Amino acid sequence: MKRYLAFFVFTIQLHAAEPPACDWVFSGGGASHDKTRAVTTDGAGNVFLASECVGDAMFGDQQHKSAGEMDMCLTKLDAAGMPLWVSGFGGSKTDRAYGVITDAAGNAYVTGHFESTDVMVNGEKLPNAGNFDAFTAKFAPDGKLLWVRVKGGEGSDYGHGIAIDSKGHVVITGAIGGQFFCTKYDAEGREIWHRSPSGKVSGSGHGIAMDGKDHIYLGGSASGAGAFGKIAIESKTSAALVLKLTPEGEGEWVNLIPGTTSAIYHEIACDSQGRVWGAGMFKGSVNVAGQTFQCSGKDYDGLIVHLDVEGQVQWARHLHGPGTDYCLGVTTDDHGTSFVCGDFNQDTVLAGHALTTRGSGDIFLAAFDVKGGLTWVQQAGGKQNDNAYPITFRAPDELIIAGALSTPATFGSHEVTISASSDLYAAKWKLKAVK
C-alpha cells in the first residue's frame, strides 16, 4: 500500500475471519525469468504491474519487444485482469521497475533503477552516471511515456518505493551512495526537495507510504551513526527502519529495530491516522515488543511490526522455519486490519500457525486484526518456486498480490498451467463480508 485511499463511512465493509476467494490470476512473460515488483490500482479498478522482463515477452495479446538484457515493464490490466497495454524502456544491460503508483487522472508513476547506458526515451539517451542509477518515470493512461527523471552518481544507486500525496506530488525512496534518501517531484517531474541523512549512516529505503495529512513514512534499513535533520539515527548493526517525515521532508520520529546480524523492512503501509505496519526479514535475532525472535539457522526469518502514530511498537509477529522466510508486502484497509504476503521454502510457522510447503517456494497471504491476532492465512503456488512481492488493498473488499511463478501453480480455484521458466503474475482476491 503506497498511499491512503479515502472512502466514506457508509462504504465500510467488515470482513469475515476466513480466507478470501481468488477472483482471477493473470500471468505473462517470455522465455526467461520475469517478475512483478510492485502493484497498484487506479480509480476505475485497473491494475498496474511494475515489472522486469528478460527478452521478448507476451502479456495476453500485448507484446513487449526487448531492448536488450532486462527491461523495466509497466503493464495495465482492466478490473477483470485482462491486459490493456504494456509499456516500458531498457537497454543492453539490467533495468528494473520497483515501485508504481497512480494519480487521480489515471497517470502512472514508476520508480526503479537502470544500468544500461544506451536507454532511449522519446528520442533522447537517458543519462547514466555509472553502474545503476535511480529513475522516476511518468506514463499517461494510454501507456505513453511522458518523462523520466534520474538520480545517482558513479556507484550503484537504486529507486525502490514511490507514493503520491493529495496535491499530486510524487515521492520516491531508495539508496544513493549507500544511504537511504527521499525525493519529492511535482506532476511535471520538477524536483521540489531531496533529503538524505548526515553523518555515517548507511542503508536503503525500500517502502514508502502517506497518511491522510501527506506525512511521509520511509521503510528500509539503516546502520551507523548520524541524523536525518534533527532526528538522531544510530545502530551498530543493520536495523529495520521507519522514519516519519513532514510534507516538507523534515524528520519527525524514527523507529529502529536492530538485528544481531541484520534486519530490514521490505515494505511498509500506513493508514489515514498515521499508524504504520512494516513487513520484512532479519538474520540472527531481534528484540521487539518484549519478545526475542531468533532465526533457527543462517537464513532469513520474516518479521511483521505494527507502530502507533508516535512510532511506538504495538505488536510484532514472526515467520519462523528452518528455511528462508520472507515477509515482503503489506497493506491495510484503514480500519486496523493489515494484510501481509511473502514466501517460504520449507515448512514454517507464521504467528503460531503452521504452513506446509507444496514445493521449493510457496506463497502466503495473511490477515492480522488491530491487536495482531492472525485472522486467516491463504497459500498459493505449486511444486516449483513461487514468490509474492507486493500487495495492495482496494476498497471495499479486494486484495491484489503479484510476483513470479513457475507452472503449474494454483491460486484458490484457479490454476496457471502455461509459462516459461518463470513468469510474472498478479492475482486478485475477494474478501468475504461478515454475514
Predicted stretch roles:
Residues 16-435:
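A sequence-level/structural motif corresponding to short, flexible coil/turn segments enriched
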